[in-house]
């Protein structure tokens, strides 16, 4: 929970500072698409092709200067895993599937950001960035079993459908034209829970579940004068 407390303090402090800044501020709206993957009791690996599912989302970004931004985002997708895909777990015979909705507020740092306009001339840039923040996820896992006798174990007593998350990630952002940027990013989220997949006491209750996304996006600037747009 120290990670959650640190992320909350960071986002609240930086959001107050950013919103108090002056006229250089601007907004961006973007859409993104990629894949979502899960790690937990039914999938120990960080990534598997079998567990990858499409994910889609939207981004609203408030930028100040060349190095900092506050971003709200949402994402929709599905997560799933099957013991049959793992040599170690195949004999157990569990599988799960769930829709997933995630929302978050993150602070973004662009270490090498520069102004894109020099004497009125646009200069494209490619910049790495990192981010962290606070968020939530909503998932309602449905567990299936190969052995009919195991079906009575689910849903588990501590089953839940809402989770607190701490998004941690980074990406690359390329400003391709005035007011337009594209990028790719990866985002890891611990859920501080072991029931994202609906399996805890019937699996490994000491290890929390994660999910992560990887994908690309395009964003468009608004709320800024043309000569002060500082896309990164």
What are these regions (language model features)?
Residues 100, 176-232:
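Predominantly the C-terminal beta-signal and adjacent terminal strand-loop region
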Residues 25, 50-54, 99-103, 124-126, ...:
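Residues that define the transmembrane beta-barrel architecture of outer-membrane proteins
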